[in-house]
UniProtKB/Swiss-Prot annotation:
It is an enzyme of class 6 (ligase). The record marks 32, 84 as: Important for tRNA non-discrimination. Its main location: cytoplasm. ATP binds at residues 223-225, 232, 481, 533-536. This is Aspartate--tRNA(Asp/Asn) ligase. It comes from Chlamydia muridarum (strain MoPn / Nigg).
């Protein structure tokens, strides 16, 4: 049986007089006194079909029984709609199909929510439980189609650049990469476990050792971590690695790749992208993920804070803290009530309060006006390049707290005051991250333990490891990290040195990474790589509010699958086969 001659978006006045066959879902049903109208929908569009009782009573009776989301196959004659009855909102709005034959392919139960009315706000849990129905509402499938085209563009471009797509194992070894692993028990080796990959990191480096030269993969990765709007327990990344190159070789490739991906949505980007060191990003934006669509740059004002008799300023400076903030152009119109809201807001991030200074008609209005002379305030206005009717917002706190608080505050104010265009795309490379961070008094990797230090900083590994910069880089878009990568360590002695600084014993290294150190010992080319977060890119490209909206079957924020009711208990016999007890 041939189910269709045309899709539901293809018919026009050019087809009038033709007999056609269509298949699809009942989108809307209307009975207008002996005339039944049905909007028949498939993935591509909608066509109105019609049956008149006087012309075909039996068929009219059958169509009158049809309900929403039944699946139909119809045959009929394409006719022009009567004058004034056209629907300009439909591609097929100038025609209708007069049905001569109808077959019900599948019936539908009563729906848990409306498919035809896309404006109804449906609870997300209900949508995820009936994901297959949610897909029929249009947005999800449109985003999946966009994702498909983005993946095609990615594969085509990387193939042009000499990258080979290789699928790496999903069942691997548990290694310390930062987040918790998802573990898979082995039936054949009782008491032993595989780990699902947090990334193909070691495999792709070993591919470089093996001489592949350039690798890529659209990889599924797994991390058992607390979720938020832009995280999922399983996610996709465009994974890349290349030999005999450095960041100056990789950056142009990634920039052109991103340009091709955005071109799928008709978005033109300007390359090369801006660059900024980690230190600059922290100093001027308070974060290593700066949103550059607007100004509100942070400025250190410790030299002016010293001139205040304000104890909070002086105490923080004495304790090694900082005083910094930003200027909001025209912000003198912010009310006291709203400033109180901002004060409560920054307290969420550890700040003790918020200092505000308004430049109004050459005069000073401030909650710390009595603690400094007018001359000091005017010096600060000059330093911040503040004009009349501007406001300075300052925080005195330890550096990390001040940065975090001001980062969130500048984003909030920029959004409230509409300081940027939502359709604006500002990319920036963040480079020269610290190689190490400190956690509970111990060194840990800022990225991962396979990241190479900058060559000029290698002598500092023994003297001052926390000051060592890494040859690593993130690509940030509008405040989102969409890619992260680094030059890799290709010298086994240096790799062992890094493991030693991370307090990994030789026994632990041999157990967890022995195979990898062995691989590095057989002649390893200099290599580097990057991984682009496909889900995050799709979230930005499609304007989705969460990553869940760009994944076909996402998990909830509690890592649950509501449609399949997973995770779920397993049978006692399955536990026994795996040698496990609960």
């Amino acid at each position: 049986m041939k189910y269709r001659t045309h899709k539901c978006n293809e018919l026009s006045l050019n087809h009038v007089g033709e007999h056609v066959r269509l298949s699809g879902w009942v989108h809307r049903y209307r009975n207008h006194g002996g005339v039944v109208f049905i909007d028949l929908r498939d993935r591509f569009g909608i066509t109105q079909i019609v049956c008149r009782q006087e012309e075909n009573p039996e068929l009219h009776r059958l169509m009158d029984q049809v309900r929403s989301e039944w699946v139909l196959c119809v045959e009929g004659l394409v006719c022009a709609r009567l004058g004034g009855m056209e629907n300009p909102n439909l591609v097929t709005g100038s025609i209708e199909v007069e049905v001569s034959h109808l077959e019900v392919l599948s019936r539908a139960q009563n729906l848990p929510f409306s498919i035809s009315d896309e404006h109804i706000n449906v609870n997300e849990e209900l949508r995820l439980t009936y994901r297959y129905l949610d897909m029929r509402r249009g947005d999800i499938v449109d985003r999946l189609m966009c994702r498909h085209k983005v993946m095609l563009a990615c594969r085509q471009y990387l193939d042009e650049q000499g990258f080979t797509e290789v699928v790496t194992p999903v069942l691997g070894k548990s290694t310390p990469e930062g987040a918790r692993d998802y573990l898979v028990p082995s039936r054949i080796y009782p008491g032993n476990f595989y780990a699902l990959p947090q990334s193909p990191q070691l495999f792709k480096q070993i591919l470089m050792v093996g001489g592949l030269d350039r690798y890529f993969q659209i990889a599924t990765c797994f991390r058992d971590e607390d979720l938020r709007a832009d995280r999922q327990p399983e996610f996709s990344q465009i994974d890349m690695e290349m030999s005999f190159g450095g960041p100056e070789d990789l950056f142009p490739i990634v920039e052109e790749l991103v340009t091709r991906l955005f071109a799928v949505k008709g978005i033109e980007l300007s390359i090369p992208f801006q660059r900024m060191t980690y230190q600059e990003a922290k100093e001027f934006y308070g974060t290593d993920k700066p949103d550059l669509r607007f100004g509100l740059r942070l400025k250190n004002c410790c030299e002016y804070a010293k001139k205040f008799s304000f104890s909070i300023f002086l105490d923080q400076l004495a304790q090694g803290g900082t005083v910094k903030g930003f200027c909001v152009p025209g912000g003198a119109d912010i009310s006291r009530k709203q400033l109180d809201v901002y004060t409560d807001f920054v307290k969420r991030y550890g700040a003790m309060g918020l200092v505000w200074i308004k430049n109004q008609d050459g005069g000073i209005s401030s909650n710390v006006a009595k603690f400094a002379s007018e001359e000091v305030f005017h010096e600060m206005f000059e330093a911040f390049e503040a004009k009349d009717q501007d406001i300075l917002l300052l925080i005195a706190a330890p550096e990390a707290i001040a940065n975090q608080s001001l980062d969130h505050l500048r984003r909030l104010i920029a959004k409230e005051r509409q300081l940027y265009d939502a359709e604006q795309y500002n990319f920036v490379w963040i480079t020269d991250f610290p190689l190490f961070a400190k956690e509970e008094g111990e060194l840990c990797s800022e990225h991962h333990p396979f990241t190479a230090p900058l060559e000029e900083d290698i002598p500092l590994l023994d003297k001052d490891p926390l000051s060592v910069r890494s040859s690593s880089y993130d690509l940030v878009l509008n405040g989102y990290e969409i890619a992260s990568g680094s030059q890799r360590i290709h010298n086994p002695d240096l790799q062992n040195k890094i493991f030693s600084l991370l307090r990994l014993s030789q026994e632990s290294v041999k157990e967890k990474f022995g195979f990898f150190i062995d691989a590095l010992s057989f002649g390893t080319p200099p290599h580097l790589g990057i991984a682009l977060g496909l889900d995050r890119i799709m979230m930005v490209l499609t304007g989705a509010e969460t990553i869940r909206e760009v994944i076909a079957f996402p998990k909830t924020q509690k890592a649950g699958d509501l449609m399949m009711s997973a995770p779920s208990e397993i049978l006692p016999i399955q536990l026994k086969e795996l040698g496990l007890k609960l």
